């Protein structure tokens, strides 16, 4: 009898993702404690040839949500796409391969020192912080062994804070389902210095309405949307090439 190996593989992947998510729950801060406010610079539309980045962050429920978002994004999106999914060492390579297979997009685990390209999707490596630098006219990924921040490594706040030092015209931020408030402080600080557009997943479609709630409570969201509508919003702001 021939077994359905694809179904077995999908089930194994799902079990791995659930295991990885359970590992980070205990280290995630409660979003209800969030009370900081930011003096945000209003978002402004920029030309299509501007320097852009898309950053998507997620925690609990993220792998499934990421598949939905990436499935709706074009292969020729006009920016590198950085993904921070809370996962420990050893899980993010499998997630990147799964997302690549399911969506047909160029998804990979970020490597230290690599140049970031438009239309490429980079997943932060589990057990490492991902930072972005600009070097000789290009954006590059830097993997860091700095201590966990708020119990998280990778941590979206660390990535967003690295962008404070980068010359960039626009950062499109999407905050998806997850416990805690990772991403809020980093985006908040970035919004005071850079041109950002912030999208949060709504409560109804979130597995855990923690991270999206925190960013919206901080008063720096441009849109709060059902999960299925987030890809079109990202594409509308970012454009294609």
Describe the function of each predicted region.
Residues 1-241:
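Strand-loop microenvironment adjacent to phosphate/nucleotide-handling motifs in alpha/beta enzyme folds
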